[in-house]
């Protein structure tokens, strides 16, 4: 029983370490004017777990930093698509 409690306590402490902050660059080719990045940034910023968003019209890219324990790339691309700007991960 003591070992079980120790294992559970260790898991509770270590679990947050497994979550990682990731940065991904999304290609957003549908941005056609200088106001589009504002809409894209607002849409991505509303996704739970996103900590930073930089959207550039000239390159038609969004660089997003997020907590992968709270969200995923799929949720980010869905957010841009729902805002009218389909996106994909830039390779």
Swiss-Prot record:
InterPro entries given in the database record: Heavy-metal-associated_CS, HMA_dom, HMA_dom_sf, MerP, MerP/CopZ
Keyword set, alphabetical order: Mercuric resistance, Mercury, Metal-binding, Periplasm, Plasmid, Signal
Protein localization: Periplasm
SUPFAM superfamilies registered for this protein in UniProt: HMA, heavy metal-associated domain
GO MF annotation: an example: mercury ion binding
Signal peptide: 1-19
Gene Ontology cellular component terms for the protein in this record: periplasmic space
PROSITE patterns: HMA_1, HMA_2
Keyword Phosphoprotein: no
Pfam families: HMA
Annotated residues for binding of Hg(2+): 33, 36
All residue ranges annotated as the HMA domain in the record: 22-88
Chief location bin: periplasm
Protein's job: Involved in mercury resistance. Acts as a mercury scavenger that specifically binds to a mercuric ion in the periplasm and probably passes it to the cytoplasmic mercuric reductase MerA via the mercuric transport protein MerT.
Family assignment from sequence similarity: Belongs to the MerP family.
Quaternary structure, from the entry: Monomer.
Protein name as it appears in the record: Mercuric transport protein periplasmic component
Gene that encodes the chain: merP
């Amino acid at each position: 029983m003591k070992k079980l409690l120790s294992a559970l306590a260790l898991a509770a402490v270590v679990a947050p370490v497994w979550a990682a902050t990731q940065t991904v660059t999304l290609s957003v080719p549908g941005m056609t004017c200088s106001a589009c990045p504002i809409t894209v940034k607002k849409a991505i910023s509303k996704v739970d777990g996103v900590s930073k968003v930089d959207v550039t019209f000239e390159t038609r890219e969004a660089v997003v930093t997020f907590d992968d324990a709270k969200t995923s790339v799929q949720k980010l691309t869905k957010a841009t698509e729902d805002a009218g700007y389909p996106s994909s991960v830039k390779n």
